[in-house]
Regions:
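Accessory alpha/beta interaction modules
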Residues: 1-126
Length: 126
């Protein structure tokens, strides 16, 4: 069950989705589409026959019928979630929306942030 701190951080981005764009674009130099259209999206990804996977928050940039980019906001307070799970989220949403996807991991703890900042080795060529 998510903690009150987890819920508060998730709501911070849910009620002001522009914050995720500002952090990625202005602080982390991520190239994102230039659009003022940002909306929250269902955060459960169904990849049958596997399990449902659910992100904390999904934001979509661009019009509903033609999304230009998606941002998955994940709040991580400990190292309990495998970093590869974040890649699963991104891949599932990329397949679902057919647009670029960025995962923004928000970690109040520096050690946890360092854990999730490591590159994820997929084993895929290229």
């Amino acid at each position: 069950m998510p903690s009150p701190r987890h819920d508060a951080l998730t709501k911070l981005f849910k009620y002001r989705p522009e914050l995720a764009v500002e952090i990625l674009r202005d602080l982390l130099d991520v190239d994102l589409p230039d659009t003022s259209l940002i909306r929250t999206e269902d955060s459960t990804f169904n990849t049958r026959p596997s399990d449902d996977i659910e992100a904390d928050l999904v934001l979509v940039l661009g019009p509903p019928q033609e999304p230009t980019h998606a941002i998955i906001v994940e709040i991580q307070q400990d190292k309990s979630k495998a970093p590869r799970q974040l890649a699963r989220y991104a891949a599932a949403l990329w397949l679902l929306l057919d647009c670029g996807v960025t995962v923004l991991v928000v970690c109040p703890d520096r050690a946890v942030a360092a854990y999730y900042a490591q590159p994820i080795e997929s084993g895929l060529p290229g």
